[in-house]
Curated annotation (Swiss-Prot):
Residues annotated as glycosylated: 22, 36, 149, 221, 245-246
Covalent lipid sites (GPI-anchor amidated asparagine): 246
Name listed for the protein in its UniProt record: Merozoite surface protein 2
Domain free text: The N-terminal region appears to be involved in lipid binding.
Domain of life: Eukaryota
Amino acid sequence: MKVIKTLSIINFFIFVTFNIKNESKYSNTFINNAYNMSIRRSMAESKPSTGAGGSAGGSAGGSAGGSAGGSAGGSAGSGDGNGADAEGSSSTPATTTTTKTTTTTTTTNDAEASTSTSSENPNHKNAETNPKGKGEVQEPNQANKETQNNSNVQQDSQTKSNVPPTQDADTKSPTAQPEQAENSAPTAEQTESPELQSAPENKGTGQHGHMHGSRNNHPQNTSDSQKECTDGNKENCGAATSLLNNSSNIASINKFVVLISATLVLSFAIFI
């Protein structure tokens, strides 16, 4: 009888210890399930938020680009119209919108107009001197000669003014050429220096690639649940772990049944 009592007491303590372990297992599974559910909810909430951000960014970018393009096009068109009006009226002076080239063209047009008037004047004066239209050829008057000389002088002054002032710089350029040749030497050294600098960068990239290769060569212990999560089946994340937990729970329940039956048998044996 003493042996049966001692066995029943030992069985009772074993039963209590198994109950404590199983309660800890149930609590762990509950925490894991709650964590998996929170992850799924966060993933589901992140999808519509990213779509709204993309649509807002696209609409803002499109509206900004359209308004900027329209305003730029309109301003450019108005600028071209002003330039065309300024070029069409040769008699008006050059405004701020026209460039230096337009001013030179207006001066040449004025010179041509002056020369055309001077060339037309002798015909009128010759017509006045020859009212009857005789076949004799008359020489131009002194006034016509003076106007032609004045027009030639104006053309010479314009050609002198149109000469660019860069000729003096060109004449002085041979003295500056040896300085440029001296400056070309450090530029050649500078072109060689990036090649020297690129060598350690290549070494660094090689080491970086080697490190990645060594990391990829290590075996990775991934469970079925992690593979499913990486494949894109977000709904199945944690499904395999929950199934394993359920199987372990079933085994523990069987153990409980066996222990309860053993305690009942021992208790009947003790009291009987």
